[in-house]
Amino acid sequence: MVTTVQDLAEQLRQAVESSNEQMIAGLASAYSGKEREKVLRAYLSATGTTAADAIRKALKNGPTENLLAYLWDKPGDVRAKLIRNALSGKNDEAALIDLVIHCSSEDWYNTCTEYTTDYKRVLNDDLLSDIGTKEQWTKVFKHWILHKRSDRFDIDGDEKRLVTAIGKKDYDTIAEMLGTTSVSEYANIVRRAEVTLGKTIDQALSAVWSKQDLAVLLAAHYELLHPARLAFHLLKQALDGKKPDEARIIRITALTFDTCLAVKYAASEAGYDIGSAFAKALDKRLAPLIKILWRVM
């Protein structure tokens, strides 16, 4: 028997009305983002309310409610709202890395569209205005959000530029390279630069910079190598701190769990048991849902 989109919307409705959190997460985990979008439309058509609103009404306040509501909402809208929150009051610099650097060109376009729809403002303008220009890390964001990358066909020259910039502590040049180099060329530049330096790029950057300046460089570096590398890096940071960063774990999970296989591979390469880390760091209500979404035991 073929399961239709309407059937899935009904299953989701039943899960929400019975507050079956594991079923809500399980349904999200079982279907791709495009399939979930169809379910969202069917849910709205059948019930007259959005799935995210229904989930928030059915569940108690807290991180679990946020996670499940994010799963069943448009990713661009979720990202737009989270960025808006991150820019409210004192900027949440960790969240900005998660939401701006860890974001594809297509996802950024959708986020900008949703942001303008929701707030009648231009996201790029608001972001640059709020973060200012005093801190070095903002230079990466200035280039990154344009999503204008192209091959320069000068791998040798770019490798020398990168090595020289690290040696001279030239943050501006590195920020510009991270924001404008094509993904394919960046990987080649990095391979050659690491031979010249005799160490990995992350080791070289870590020897020169620290705190948010370093965090943004590393995030952009990992994202260009592969988004799953950055997702794992951010999750590990959130899990291994003195106090688990639930908000970051929820952000990364809600917006990235479709790539769970690649992220788990990155974790396995590092010899990191991400399933055990989730179980240890999170409470008994949230941990099972996170593990369902990442498909770990």
Swiss-Prot record:
Biological processes, Gene Ontology terms: cytoskeleton organization
Gene3D superfamilies found in the cross-reference section: Annexin
Molecular function terms, GO-annotated: calcium ion binding; calcium-dependent phospholipid binding; phosphatidylserine binding
Alphabetized UniProt keyword annotations: Annexin, Cytoplasm, Cytoskeleton, Microtubule, Repeat
Protein location: Cytoplasm, Cytoskeleton
Family: Belongs to the annexin family. Giardin subunit alpha subfamily.
Function description: Giardins are involved in parasite attachment to the intestinal mucosa and in the cytoskeletal disassembly and reassembly that marks the transition from infectious trophozoite to transmissible cyst. They may interact with other cytoskeletal proteins such as microtubules in the microribbons or crossbridges, to maintain the integrity of the ventral disk.
PANTHER family: ANNEXIN, ANNEXIN B11
Protein name: Giardin subunit alpha-6
